Amino acid sequence: MIQTVVVYFSASLTLTLITPNFKSNKDLLFVLLIHYIVFYLSDFYRDFWSRGYLEEFKMVLKYSFYYIFISSSLFFIFKNSFTTTRLSFFTFIAMNSILLYLLNSFLKYYRKYSYAKFSRDTKVVLITNKDSLSKMTFRNKYDHNYIAVCILDSSEKDCYDLKHNSLRIINKDALTSELTCLTVDQAFINIPIELFGKYQIQDIINDIEAMGVIVNVNVEALSFDNIGEKRIQTFEGYSVITYSMKFYKYSHLIAKRFLDITGAIIGLLICGIVAIFLVPQIRKDGGPAIFSQNRVGRNGRIFRFYKFRSMRVDAEQIKKDLLVHNQMTGLMFKLDDDPRITKIGKFIRKTSIDELPQFYNVLKGDMSLVGTRPPTVDEYEKYNSTQKRRLSFKPGITGLWQISGRNNITDFDEIVKLDVQYINEWSIWSDIKIILLTLKVVLLGTGAK
């Protein structure tokens, strides 16, 4: 998808600058059509992430030769149908080849850099036994951030050295409940096969996997049926079987971040324009224009969340008295005709303008354009392991709940079901679809109060 943008840019620039009196979009459509044909004929995505820089150069050359051959053939057949000159065509081929090579090289570099950063930021819980632990070295070249360890055949007294290294010790009988409260991205299970039955490892994997936490099992361990997907990869130098409810295409994850950054920049520009007129109206009661609050993001990370203030300054204190009138069933608060909402607040909520400052959260990387809604800290602290699954993805400004008539949903479990459906079925195309449907909902003024 990103390569298509490069092709379109190269074609637009060369055709506009070099071709005399160029006005036809037909040539641009022709260029893109050939790109898609050549893209698949040349098997452009095969071994994309494992190709070195020399192999990438060869692949771009192969793509370009295919492009020249097919284009020349079609130009010959339909020679009177296009305004493109030979000079503009070969200039396009040269520019397109250079930009494609640079783009693909950058994507690989970014992936390598982001994976290294991701590894350092990844919070891992180790589940092991004493013998396996003695053969491991913590905080080595792999840089994963171990935050806790559960030693299945040891008591807490045996773990003094680990405590000294700031590792939290988890009792095996409270493993699931403690992981529900911790910020955890992955679990690494490293014990011999013969101990699997004794410590009910399959049940442990299923419980952790159900939270949306990735589970890595040393590949020497027994492979068995799990509730999600699994694949063999490396972790800390071991070959492991990795269990997850779903594995996502890395190209789609990059596209999602690219979409987030682009959308956030546009959104912040709109936010700045709106703020010029809106801020004085909000501040008429003497309070701040921006409401900020700690919210819970991916896998339990706490971040500062921003909105245009639509409620009284003392709204959080009054909320305690209004909890008895909560219209939601479960761990979320909603009240029609909420007395805390200000006069201007009713308007900005109805039009969803209050959400605009969250584009800053998206740009920072705390949130995404599309995802699940971030809960408050007090709501999160009451989650069970199944409900925590909705936090296995970055929270978003919009999502399935927002386009599914959110004012008609009063059961929190129904919201969790929609969030899990989004996570299970996610692709970049589903995000684009939700964004388009959100624009429709906002323009029609439905779904928000």
Swiss-Prot record:
The chain crosses the membrane at residues 5-22, 27-46, 59-78, 88-107, 258-280. It is an enzyme of class 2 (transferase). Keywords: Capsule biogenesis/degradation, Cell membrane, Exopolysaccharide synthesis, Membrane, Transferase, Transmembrane, Transmembrane helix, Virulence. It comes from the Bacteria. GO terms for molecular function: phosphotransferase activity, for other substituted phosphate groups. The gene is cpsE. It is a multi-pass membrane protein. It is found in: Cell membrane. It comes from Streptococcus agalactiae serotype V (strain ATCC BAA-611 / 2603 V/R). One of its GO terms (cellular component) is plasma membrane. Its EC number is 2.7.8.-. Belongs to the bacterial sugar transferase family. NCBIfam families: EPS_sugtrans. GO terms for biological process: polysaccharide biosynthetic process. This is Galactosyl transferase CpsE. PANTHER family: COLANIC BIOSYNTHESIS UDP-GLUCOSE LIPID CARRIER TRANSFERASE (PTHR30576), SLL5057 PROTEIN (PTHR30576:SF10). InterPro entries: Bact_transf, EPS_sugar_tfrase. Galactosyl transferase is essential for the assembly of the group B streptococci (GBS) type III capsular polysaccharide. May be involved in the formation of either or both galactosidic bonds by catalyzing the addition of galactose to an oligosaccharide precursor or to a lipid intermediate. Type III capsular polysaccharide consists of a linear backbone with short side chains ending in residues of N-acetylneuraminic acid or sialic acid. Pfam families: Bac_transf.
